[in-house]
Amino acid sequence: MEKFEILQSKPVMEMLAVAMEYCRFINEIQNYELPEAFDFLQKILPALYLKGSLFPTVEVEEDSANERFVTEEEYETMRVRTAAHLGDRDYFSTVDLANDDINAVPVSLSELLADIYTDLKDFILLYAKESTAAKENAVANCRYYFQTGWGVRVTQALPYIHFVLSAPDEEE
């Protein structure tokens, strides 16, 4: 398959669509009641993971076209806003398999969601540029960050989201 065909392929277009839906939702998460927000996350995160696992490999010819767009300030604003909305549902415990640590460590769901957002928003904005080099970098970065960043974060967030949605109501 030609590089241009890969850059316009179904897996790339589907990833763009799901990533855009995720980023739109995270930007507006405060407009949703928590049960509705958790329900949406339970559906979109597996879709992101599936699309990421099917993502093509692209050889980057011109890495000078590579850019990151989401600033640290934007990241922090989004994380704090999401944490405030999640309230006492923001923190949970998990094990850190990357460091072979079987002891529970605290994790912030808002931080995981902001990390995922940052990688995906950067992918969307870089891919939107006109040049083939920018699109190559966007696709290569999305695959790389799936393997090292946002893909791992999805797998950390999903068990907690499942727990929150399946736990009996405290009022019962």
Name each region found by the language model:
Residues 12-70:
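N-terminal interaction modules that seed assembly of large macromolecular complexes
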Residues 14-21, 40-47, 77, 81-84, ...:
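Charged, amphipathic alpha-helical oligomerization/scaffolding segments
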Residues 1-14:
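N-terminal leader/propeptide segments of preproteins
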Residues 4, 25, 38-40, 55, ...:
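Phenylalanine-focused residue identity feature
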Residues 10-13, 73-76, 80, 111, ...:
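Generic alpha-helical secondary structure signal
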Residues 57-124:
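Long amphipathic alpha-helical segments
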Residues 1-3, 101-107, 115, 119-172:
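Acidic, proline/glycine-rich low-complexity IDRs
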Residues 1-4, 25-33, 96-106:
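Short, charged, low-complexity loops and linkers
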